[in-house]
């Protein structure tokens, strides 16, 4: 009986540590963007973007925000992604000092 209690205690401690590891900022979450969309999104539907780099993802990715509020991941080095980024950069006015 004593061995069972000890094993249960060790299991609970291991579970607590694994939860903390997954809760770290570099833990896996939707923003790591490892699941990317290969299909081209029309530029007119895009509102903004942000670049994502993570040690948990093997490639650099971009998250596009559409005019309808959806977020779509895409691989940063695809030609259509680079064109969409250039398009959004041209649309966004640069602030004057």
Curated annotation (Swiss-Prot):
Pfam family membership, one: IL8
Predominant cellular place of this UniProt entry's protein: secreted
SMART domains per UniProt: SCY (SM00199)
GO cellular component: extracellular space
Any one GO biological process: inflammatory response
Keyword terms: Chemotaxis, Cytokine, Disulfide bond, Glycoprotein, Heparin-binding, Inflammatory response, Pyrrolidone carboxylic acid, Secreted, Signal
Modification Pyrrolidone carboxylic acid, positions: 24
Signal peptide region: 1-23
Glycosylated residues (UniProt): 29
GO molecular function per UniProt: CCR1 chemokine receptor binding; CCR2 chemokine receptor binding; chemokine activity; heparin binding
Compartments where located: Secreted
Disulfide bonds, paired cysteine numbers: 33-57, 34-73
Family: Belongs to the intercrine beta (chemokine CC) family.
Function text: Chemotactic factor that attracts monocytes and eosinophils, but not neutrophils. Augments monocyte anti-tumor activity.
Subunit structure: Monomer. Interacts with TNFAIP6 (via Link domain).
PANTHER family to which the protein is assigned, alphabetical: C-C MOTIF CHEMOKINE 7, SMALL INDUCIBLE CYTOKINE A
Protein name: C-C motif chemokine 7
Organism: Mus musculus
